[in-house]
Amino acid sequence: MSNLTVLGGDPHRLGATITDNGVNFAIFSRDAVRVLICFFENYNSKTPYAVAELDPAKNRTGDIWHALIPEVKKGSLYLYRIDG
């Protein structure tokens, strides 16, 4: 699996937002204790090529989990894995 840079991100725009610096992810989850974003090569992939684990100290504001990931590009396939 590839390593990704996980920056703080912006909690104010929910969803996946393309920016000049990468893709910003923001999702509401009141009960989450752990959030991962898994990235896939294509629709048939069974395992992710990269996983970004969000740090609650820098990637959580209230009930919003957020991250800016510079390596992610438009059209990337992803899913959230949330514990809690």
Predicted regions and their residues:
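Non-catalytic, glycine-rich low-complexity segments
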Residues: 1-33
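Aromatic- and glycine-rich beta-strand/loop motifs that create alpha-glucan
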Residues: 30-75, 83-84
